[in-house]
Amino acid sequence: MSYPEIYPPDQPGFHPIATARTMFVDEIDRAGIETMLERLEASTAMMRAVQIRVLGGAMARVPDDATAFAHRDRKFMVNVAALYERPEEAEVYAPWVADLAAKLQRGPVGAYVGFLGDEGEERVRDAYPKTTWDRLAEIKARYDPSNLFRLNQNVPPTGT
């Protein structure tokens, strides 16, 4: 299937919905690959994916506390996703994503904040080690103490 066939241009009213789960893993073994392939083939989602991004190299040489992005020592970032057309299909595809992600999780829990959906504060916390979270909360308290800019993957200011 070519890319234009995935999202045909000028298709009025077409607004796909996505559900996804992001994580970091330290190992992808044969059983994990077979699980991915079996689940992808079995899914009826209009588009489904397991995206694997190999990490390491220069980014792994940056200390965790040098920036807000952490988990630099992890081997892979994985994103499991399903796209569908009708809101009621979430009942089918959200559990599919969650189950497949749980089967692939290897190592400590983590998340890439740029791929998080509306998953709650616990998942936002998964994106940052405690020291990074605390540092971001202190910065937020200094520059946005009323938490005006909160309609995002929010780190609340210290003291709230």
Region locations from a protein language model:
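Soluble FAD-dependent oxygen oxidases
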Residues: M1-T160
